Amino acid sequence: MVSSNHCATLTRCAAAVAAALLSLQASAQAPSPTTTAPEAGLSAITVTGNWLDNPTEEKVLDHAGARTIVERARIEETGSSSLRDVLRLVPGVQVQDSNGTGGSDVSLNIGVRGLTARLSPRSYVLMDGVPVSYAPYGQPQLSLAPVSLGNLESVDVIRGAGSVRYGPQNVGGIINFVTRAIPKTFAAEASVGTEIYSHGGNAKTTPSLFVGGTNESGLGLALLYSGTHGDGWRAGNDKTDIDDILVKGAYRISAQDDIAVSLHHFEGSGRMPGGLTAAQYAADPFQSTRSYDSFDGRRTDASFKYNHKDGRNNFEVLGYYVDSFRGSYIEQDNANQRRLTAAPRSYHYFGIEPRYSRLFETGSVVQEVSVGYRYLKESSSEVALRTAYYNPATMANAMALPITPYQTSQGGTTAHAFYIDDRIDIGNWTITPGVRYERINSFNNVSNLGADGSTVTSQLFPKADAREFLPTLSVLYRMNAQWSLFANAGKSFGPQQYAQLAQTERGLHPESAKTYEVGTHYNSPALNAELTLFNIDFDKELLLTRVGVDGIWTDLGATRHRGIESSLRYDLGQWNAALKGLTAGVSYTYTEAVSRAGDFAGRDLPLYSRHTGQLWARYALGQWTLNADLAAQSKQRSPGSGTQYVTQEDAAGQLGDIPGFATVGLRAGYDFGKSLSNLRVAVGVKNLFERRYYTRSTDNNGGKYVGMPRTLYVQGTLPF
């Protein structure tokens, strides 16, 4: 939980940074360009270097794989209040509502192309290029997702052709949350949003603050704050409190060299209302029968980045240190009794990533060769505790019961990654071969304790070493300045996690997959479109299943994920002047993710939809902006892990098919302009027609989880 000392520290830091920012206002001016003109022999061609920097639609057009950028304006106009809302806008990405042990706004459950969504383990998730998971190798789950929406400028989702530069756990692509940049002149903005739910009588507020600027000497500073506070739509035990503060600094050393630093602190706590049995859901889908389930976590990280770019050469060094903690309380059910479990865990890691890129010319052929390295060292300390069993009907306060540790573990990983790729431009063609080499050494020392919580009864000392070459080849052809075609093939890899190392008797292996894409990008002032065919062949895939109250990792074996992703946005005013201000868009994704081994061979994997789609329209008239959105998904499966593929709902509400659904949202916004200090306000509604939908979970607090009911929201933004 957030302590008073932490709050006092954050307050003092915020006050100091705000004072420094105000001192910049008087002298702030637009800085001079940070790169020189290209060398004469290169004409307009300049080195790209890190293609995660400054994501734009032009970069998407030049990327030889599926890539989607969701910008801040689109985030605001969809009424998004969480990372989940934004990622639902991306073709191929499916988002599970909060459920199970990922059952609060502090966590993030996303699955790409039919991959498991529970705690987002198979996408490499970054914020400004820095990993956001507890431990990128040993604990990649996002039960704590330390990113708050109000601090973001855009969300960059790279689903293909990224595994050479970024990893591990990249079979589900790379997701980079891009925070707001330090402005060239002094700027500040405060905003707040509030959601009011039609059930539970609850409301949730999302305040944010941004202030920053750059002075004439090239020194820039920015303070960003974003939070979430309030209760959700369940009748009890679903309060959320999130505070996310980021301080960014930058200094332009010369026209070719600059440095950037950041200091980030995130604290979040979320109550988890838990799942319902089939009978409980039928009686009241919004009730909660769990009073103690909760999750809290915090993360502090710092990063430093040096960048040199002269048109032909680009050298970059990124270093970061991350310290995080997470704790949870969850009740376990057994024969009409319960016991309270706790799982405090601490992690920290240090990483350094140098990279060098250089342009070469050979006649009409231009090459950009990039070489990079990453050293990452991480450690973990985990404790598992539990009370004795009790009768929940008569227990007044389970938190007052003695709670005893029964297992401890100390883990760590030392990893070296090397990569090289060569972007070869020949006329309209770009061919990029590359390879990444991962060398990983991991261990997890596990001690099982007796009933007294101190006597060691048994120990395990598993280790794992991995040496993996991950080649990729991508090809892009430019039909013209607005249209490109692409294809790529590569190999992705996921090392064993700490919890998997401890299960030595189950014969678990690192995950590996081969990925293939063919597609196209189109970008013009009137039309923006993308179309991608994809195929993922998993040689090995691990799955977390439940045996009684315990979570067990099993080797699911071979799986195949294939399908088509598409999206289109059209400015109808470019077609007919009478439709000026009207823009419409549509997206559709078909995914087939099936097991190719075991009892469920040929059957759908759990908790993904074969069909997902969106239809939206935007109309701007004067100072008004009107938005309408429709989102739909087909049914999902929750078949269990036994020998029978379950399709009918069980009494616990954990297994059985999940019906598809569609929801409609409307929004109206007004910009007062200079008449009222550029104030922007909006009002909207989500799930307009009160469509009742749900998901399932097989966790200890699993069952049926009702989705968002009709929700009214208001937004206000004031620049100053």
Where are these regions (language model features)?
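Membrane-embedded beta-barrel scaffold of Gram-negative outer-membrane proteins
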Residues: 209, 305-310, 314-332, 478, ...
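N-terminal periplasmic accessory domains that precede
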Residues: 83-86, 108-114, 123-128, 142-148, ...
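Structural signature of Gram-negative outer-membrane beta-barrels, strongest in the C-terminal barrel
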Residues: 254, 263-264, 361-377, 409-538, ...
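C-terminal beta-signal and adjacent terminal beta-strands/loops
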Residues: 4, 582, 635-641, 670-720
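Transmembrane beta-barrel wall of Gram-negative outer-membrane proteins
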Residues: 200-273, 294-305, 416
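Extracytoplasmic beta-strand/coil segments of soluble accessory domains associated
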Residues: 59, 84, 88-131
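Short acidic/polar hinge/loop motifs at secondary-structure boundaries
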Residues: 130-159, 247
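Gram-negative outer-membrane beta-barrel transporters
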Residues: 191, 356-364, 369, 431, ...
